[in-house]
Amino acid sequence: MDPNCSCATGGSCTCTGSCKCKECKCTSCKKSCCSCCPMSCAKCAQGCICKGASEKCSCCA
């Protein structure tokens, strides 16, 4: 569980555009929770969902 996030790993997340999660792996987490994408990834902000920093994100080149 991410100390900056109230949701359980793999669960539903209530954070959206103002997400402060750093290692959040919630299935519904979006935007800045996308740990496998760079912070400036425009496509990520459009709804990319990543489940781990080690995964390659399909939204990023």
Swiss-Prot record:
Give the matching PROSITE patterns. Answer: METALLOTHIONEIN_VRT
A Gene Ontology annotation in the biological process aspect, one of them, is: cellular response to copper ion
The GO molecular function terms of this record are: metal ion binding; zinc ion binding
Which key words are in the record?
Answer: Acetylation, Cadmium, Copper, Metal-binding, Metal-thiolate cluster, Phosphoprotein, Zinc
- Record GO cellular component, one term: cytosol
- InterPro entries, per this entry? Metalthion_dom_sf, Metalthion_dom_sf_vert, Metalthion_vert, Metalthion_vert_metal_BS
One protein family per Pfam: Metallothio
> Which residues of the sequence carry a binding annotation for a divalent metal cation 6?
37, 41, 44, 60
Question: Is the keyword Lipid biosynthesis in the record?
Answer: no
| Chain positions recorded as a divalent metal cation 3 binding sites | 15, 19, 24, 29
Modified sites of kind Phosphoserine = 58
Q: Tell me the residue numbers annotated for binding a divalent metal cation 1.
A: 5, 7, 21, 24
Region of interest (Alpha), residue spans: 30-61
Where a divalent metal cation 7 is bound, by residue? 50, 57, 59-60
Renumbered to this chain, region (Beta) spans 1-29
As for family, the record states: Belongs to the metallothionein superfamily. Type 1 family.
What do we know about how this protein assembles, alone or with others? Answer: Monomer.
* Protein name stated in the entry: Metallothionein-1A
Q: What is the lineage of its organism?
A: Eukaryota, Metazoa, Chordata, Craniata, Vertebrata
